[in-house]
């Protein structure tokens, strides 16, 4: 610590000022505050620092000194008296004294902590108020510029550590200069407060990532040393002890925030960093946590960010799933968010299907409505890229599909049934789902291949999706809805079993449907497409290569990496049971 080594020189320098008059009392030392160039006095006996010259008659100046040093000098003096368990009347409840170790008196360190840190803290707080204007210059810049100063000012660091736990290393205050020992103490204290910041002087460079150094400029540099005591008094009087500590401290935080505001957004962006900062700063000084200004915001940021993350996860899955269907199965949504997802999907489905069923009797339209509503939230299901963005196109495509393929025809009668009697929306929903299932059933009938085939995976996924959709239908206590749902589930399960039997290979994939909540959301458009493809196949015959290529393209779009999904599916199977 250059400061520590310099302290004797500092004494000499300051000697030019006050110490010219006469020697300091034993145990006292003069140091110069590198920031302001003002001399201040370190009482190693009581381990306090003060702006007031002990050689001045104690009456007024002593009082001023007490105010300068902290809310009350007596308090700080008392601390040393009860060194074993110092009492910190001056500290606000949240604040935690920062241990300050003096180089010279390593053996007495424990006491140093309390007595010394106390005054430092208070002074720093008052000064912080003063300093804030300049500090606002920019903590970051301050950190760099004042890295050098920090070497001298480590001592002050303790104070800053309490006020700005994260920033201690760069907080520069008279403390550094306050005592040659102070340099050590400050460094130790800073290290104590900031595990990551080694020597406080180094600390300025080593600040943990999120931390912003707080340059501390003392207002005193405006006033002359003689005036200092009075100036401090004035400050103290403005803010009685606790206020003195608190108000200035708030400025410190405000300043930090002012300069931090730029970093803050970043912090919000990266919840991890904000927790880090919150945590380390908290370690550094619970005092900081005491001040709602700083900590809460990181915390808030954290929670907010966390919530959005799940949300974002949930919402993207619909988007991505259409594109990589098989992938999405095991994808984050599947295992991680299934619970959340299912409700989301359920809601979407219910919302979509209810209006669908009520609004549009024709099956094709039903499908269209669903498709349009589902894709709208996730406009990037690439399986039907054009269709998804523009529901009208979807409608057209589906209408084509409906008239042309046989699968749509069976669906039509069902929809007709739905139309004729005014049915409960739940029943309509179930019927709409079963229409899709019918198309899938035909796809299953025409399916030949392995369980690893894209087509198999797609059909299975669609069926699973329909299963989940059926599960999501709310019977609302109506027996007819419940019965329809039950029948639909049975039907889907039998189709799934049939598909399994037809497929060769990899057993146990049926269970994937249990995992599929994630796929629910965006599969509807795919399903319609699938239905169309299946219809084409039925129409043209499996031998026809056109439908196959179509389906392959669709599948490729929907499930670009089939194999990854496959292992994932199998993994999912393991999980699902």
Curated annotation (Swiss-Prot):
Bias type Polar residues, positions: 1-17
Native source species: Mus musculus (Mouse)
Region (Disordered): 1-81, 126-207, 229-427, 524-577
Physiological role: Co-chaperone and adapter protein that connects different classes of molecular chaperones including heat shock proteins 70 (HSP70s), e.g. HSPA1A/HSP70 or HSPA8/HSC70, and small heat shock proteins (sHSPs), e.g. HSPB8. Acts as a nucleotide-exchange factor (NEF) promoting the release of ADP from HSP70s, thereby triggering client protein release. Nucleotide release is mediated via BAG3 binding to the nucleotide-binding domain (NBD) of HSP70s, whereas client release is mediated via its binding to the substrate-binding domain (SBD). Has anti-apoptotic activity.
Subunit-level organization: Forms a ternary complex with HSPA1A/HSP70 and HSPB8, serving as scaffold subunit. Component of the chaperone-assisted selective autophagy (CASA) complex consisting of BAG3, HSPA8/HSC70, HSPB8 and STUB1/CHIP. Binds to the ATPase domain of HSP70 chaperones. Interacts with BCL2. Interacts with phospholipase C-gamma proteins. Interacts with DNAJB1 and DNAJB6. Interacts (via BAG domain) with HSF1; this interaction occurs in normal and heat-shocked cells. Interacts with HSPA8/HSC70 (via NBD), HSPA1A (via NBD) and HSPA1B (via NBD). Interacts (via WW domain 1) with SYNPO2 (via PPPY motif).
Domain WW per the UniProt entry, residue ranges: 22-56, 126-157
Compositionally biased spans, kind Pro residues: 332-341, 376-392
Compositional bias annotation for Basic and acidic residues: 256-265, 535-548
Omega-N-methylarginine sites (modified residues): 141, 267
Protein name per the record: BAG family molecular chaperone regulator 3
Cross-link (Glycyl lysine isopeptide (Lys-Gly) (interchain with G-Cter in SUMO2)): 450
Residue ranges of every copy of the BAG domain listed in the record: 426-503
Compartments, as annotated in UniProt: Nucleus; Cytoplasm
Cross-link (Glycyl lysine isopeptide (Lys-Gly) (interchain with G-Cter in SUMO1)): 450
Domain statement: The BAG domain interacts with the nucleotide-binding domain (NBD) of HSP70s and is essential for the nucleotide-exchange factor activity.
Main location: nucleus
